[in-house]
Amino acid sequence: MNFRLLYFASLADRAGRAEETRESAADTPRALYAEVASLHGFAFDRERLRVAVNGAFVGWDHALADRDEVVFLPPVSGG
């Protein structure tokens, strides 16, 4: 399957890009994050992130489909 991945904040910094298209056999955000975390060296544990698919927040075991847009959102701070 092909996915459009969007990264924000420190994840985008670490990946060196804000988005990428990736071919993967991952069938859940959990599996896809494990793959890209290893590839890009992401340090965040999955429990600290939010994930959205096609504009809606979903759980880590949500079933992915070809051409889904997947967004991994790290915690942000500010004031």
Predicted region positions:
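Ubiquitin-like/PB1-type beta-grasp interaction modules and other compact soluble beta-rich domains
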Residues: 1-78
